[in-house]
Amino acid sequence: MSVQVAAPGSAGLGPERLSPEELVRQTRQVVQGLEALRAEHHGLVGHLAEALAGQGPVTGLEMLEEKQQVVSHSLEAIELGLGEAQVLLALSAHVGALEAEKQRLRSQARRLAQENVWLREELEETQRRLRASEEAVAQLEEEKRHLEFLGQLRQYDPPAESQQSESPPRRDSLASLFPSEEEERKGPEAAGAAAAQQGGYEIPARLRTLHNLVIQYAGQGRYEVAVPLCRQALEDLERSSGHCHPDVATMLNILALVYRDQNKYKEATDLLHDALQIREQTLGPEHPAVAATLNNLAVLYGKRGRYREAEPLCQRALEIREKVLGADHPDVAKQLNNLALLCQNQGKFEDVERHYARALSIYEALGGPHDPNVAKTKNNLASAYLKQNKYQQAEELYKEILHKEDLPAPLGAPNTGTAGDAEQALRRSSSLSKIRESIRRGSEKLVSRLRGEGAAGAAGMKRAMSLNTLNVDAPRALGTQFPSWHLDKAPRTLSASTHDLSPH
């Protein structure tokens, strides 16, 4: 038996399409009505049975039996309707469960699709990193071969240079950029130099011991001792002399150096700005100490890659030193070197060549063509030429350095000089060994770049090969120059390393 359910008030308008939720709700209402009707029919059946049991006449009995049959048929129809309604409700619940499962599966499919996209992206990133790692490994293997070759060349270096290379002094990791004022005055003998100058301002006697201790601790890497020592001394000075005092500026300068050695360039820069302000107020804007602080600030900005901000500071330091010390003073030449390096990192090569040329003329006028500073400046100028692809000019400078610079006498050569001459030669050997190592790297870069030019650079390659015989068979005595055949026919050649000589 089927049951047709119509919405209330829709009589005569035909059946109306109901939503699944409304259909289920009305079906439940029908079930409740049928259950009530079934209970009522059960009551009628009971009353009819009682009436039949007590009825006497035959005609009345037949009527009651007929009523009982009608009620029984109605009760069966009600039972059938209830069964169909229960089936409909169960079917609705099942359909609802299937729909929920369908939605869950759709959601899971969307999530899996998104995860698949993520996994694909992760796989691509992993493959990219793998390729980069393989390229890095190949580059490192090539660099390792170059370093092994250069290590084999070191056995031909003079003994004095070898000993120095085994125990090099501790330097700043970015000292290849350019030295600050204090770096040039600081060394193993600093503890014994009681009147050492720091940035053009003489360290007071009461601060010299503290300064030497801080330099010693910083040189040993014991910054946990050096920094509190500086801060305690700074607090004592500020309590006794006030903040705006030259001694406070000096201590700020020392603490800035310690921070710089720890690569804490921002903290060091803030301290130097404070020291600069104090020195300008107490010593005047054109004092050499102000110029030194400006130079140190320029160095820190340069090491942080902020060359545009460093250049005006370096330019102002140069102007002060020219006015106070004269245009031909060695400190002016040092400042010109620093300014040239800053310009080089900004691509201002015309200014670079002009500054180096002026510094070179100052060094040659003061110390002659054999002054180590002359070779150092020429080496820097050659590096600038390399950056401009001026290989011929760079080659000529390297040749000039190699031909003009004296080298230490080889092991076993007769010693005819006095003790003072030997000490001077030792100091000169130490300086030249550093210059020689710098020239070695520059010539490697020159050879590497010329090789990269292919056939067009074949002529330049022949010129460059005359530079790849550094440190071979030193002359018998100091002052002897390299003969030209020695540069052209030496069996040892430098590796075409990709190491960049230029400052970073």
Curated annotation (Swiss-Prot):
Q: Which residues carry this modification: Phosphothreonine?
A: 498
Report the leader peptide range. none
Gene3D superfamilies, from UniProt?
A: Tetratricopeptide repeat domain
> InterPro entries per the record?
Kinesin_light (IPR002151), TPR-like_helical_dom_sf (IPR011990), TPR_rpt (IPR019734)
List the GO molecular function terms.
kinesin binding
Q: Which residues does this entry mark as bearing Phosphoserine?
A: 173, 466, 502
Q: What is known of its domains?
A: The heptad repeat (HR) motif is sufficient for interaction with kinesin heavy (KHL) chains and ODF1. The TPR region is involved in mitochondrial binding.
Function according to Swiss-Prot or TrEMBL: Kinesin is a microtubule-associated force-producing protein that may play a role in organelle transport. Plays a role during spermiogenesis in the development of the sperm tail midpiece and in the normal function of spermatozoa. May play a role in the formation of the mitochondrial sheath formation in the developing spermatid midpiece.
**Protein name (database record):** Kinesin light chain 3
Tell me the organism.
Answer: Pongo abelii (Sumatran orangutan)
